[in-house]
A protein has these predicted regions:
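Positively charged, low-complexity/disordered segments
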Residues: 2-6
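Cell-wall glycan-active module
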Residues: 7-203, 292-362
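Extracellular, surface-exposed passenger/stalk and repeat segments of large secreted bacterial proteins
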Residues: 10-19, 213, 257, 285, ...
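Short secondary-structure boundary segments
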Residues: 151-157, 213-216, 223
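Solvent-exposed, acidic/flexible segments
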Residues: 156, 185-193, 203, 207, ...
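Short, functionally critical alpha-helical segments immediately adjacent to catalytic or ligand/cofactor-binding
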Residues: 194-221
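Catalytic and binding regions of secreted/periplasmic enzymes and modules that target cell-wall glycans
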Residues: 216, 223-349
């Protein structure tokens, strides 16, 4: 489920988008820090005391990992209030009442029913739910910390086997697709895993992030997908949208996304996406140039945009749980690979945060 992806950025004349220089250096020295060095590093970064115990546990298990404080300069309550505005963050209507907003424009007290904002089940999230999913301290563990991982492509540990792990139990695992070479016009076939690796090299975005995003956006079971990637929607035949780009919240998000993907006049990001290759690679270019290069270079910042660029808007997904869900998928992809990998995590720090973590809604 996506939101805010209908924004079309500056037209690119080349077939491949030239990316802006990244604000964070990708190459990291593979050196394990001692406990004393790590304590000094946390102090230098300015992490609050309420972050440190969880970070110590992560350092103990993964001494090669580095943790950077992303100082937002924003008041915590203000940020939560902005992200809690009706329609900005959605949650499944199947959740208990405490997770769902009861504001007048989100809930009808006379009928006891919630207003649906997307599809048939997505309603406005409560302020308590937003605070719970937005509080970085709730996710400083080796299961969900990946929402803070920097999303630039790092070839030293991001491999085909890792992408295959993400694609396992999906219709894309060990499968080929047909496409037309964007340079020669020749008909070819390619494995999906190869397409994600090529997309990473071209866009400079993490292939694990790209594969995880596609898995969340369009995979509906081990054998089925959304119609966004079948090329069979009658109003947009032969059009594919693997990342659901342009699928803004409405009663017909898939059609909105396919309309965006079919835009021949724009000519950007390899559009129109007339085969899986164009969609996977072109979509990666869009995500990288439109989000990562704008400073939204973690899953957390793509979900909760607390950067200076279009703050509190330009958010990739409306699903308030999306960053957490993608983090779990990344964890599975990394299994057995991470002990000595030089991952870098950028963790938001807000002003005036409560001493205790924001609790789960009850």
């Amino acid at each position: 489920m996506s939101r805010g992806l209908g924004d079309v950025y500056k037209r690119q004349n080349a077939k491949y988008v030239k990316l802006a220089k990244k604000p964070v250096t990708k190459k990291v020295a593979v050196v394990a820090m001692s406990d004393a060095q790590f304590e000094q590093a946390m102090k230098n970064e300015g992490f609050p005391e309420s972050y440190k115990q969880s970070l110590r546990a992560l350092h103990s298990a993964y001494p090669y990992w580095q943790f950077k404080a992303y100082k937002t300069g924003l008041d915590w309550n203000t940020a939560v209030t902005e992200e809690s505005k009706t329609g900005v963050n959605l949650i499944s209507n199947a959740r208990a009442k405490a997770w769902k907003s009861t504001e007048k424009d989100a809930y009808d007290a006379s009928t006891g029913k919630w207003k649906v904002f997307d599809g048939s089940t997505w309603v406005a999230a409560s302020k308590a739910a937003v605070a719970y999913f937005m509080d970085p301290r709730n996710y400083l563990n080796d299961r969900s910390v990946y929402m803070f991982e920097l999303l630039e492509y790092q070839s030293q540990y991001q491999t085909k086997s890792g992408v295959n792990t993400i694609l396992s139990n999906t219709p894309f695992y060990n499968k080929k697709f047909s496409y037309t070479d964007v340079n020669t016009g020749a008909a070819k076939t390619m494995y999906y895993v190869t397409a994600f690796m090529e997309a990473a090299k071209i866009s400079k975005a993490s292939p694990y992030h790209l594969a995880s995003r596609v898995k969340q956006e369009v995979v509906t079971s081990a054998t089925t997908t959304s119609t966004a990637v079948t090329g069979t929607v009658s109003s947009y035949p032969g059009i594919y949208n693997f990342y659901n780009i342009g699928a803004t919240s409405s009663s017909t998000p898939v059609l909105n996304g396919l309309k965006w993907a079919s835009d021949k006049k724009a000519g950007t990001y390899l559009r129109p996406w007339t085969d899986p290759y164009r969609s996977i690679v072109g979509g990666a270019q869009y995500i990288s140039s439109g989000y990562i290069a704008k400073g939204q270079n973690t899953c957390y910042l793509e979900k909760f945009n607390v950067t200076s660029y279009k703050r509190y808007s330009h958010q990739y997904m409306t699903n308030v749980e999306a960053a957490y869900e993608e983090s779990i998928k990344t964890k599975k992809a990394y299994a057995g690979m991470m002990d000595k990998s030089p991952l870098v995590f950028s963790i938001p720090v807000y002003e005036n945060m409560p001493a205790a973590n924001s609790p789960m809604p009850k």
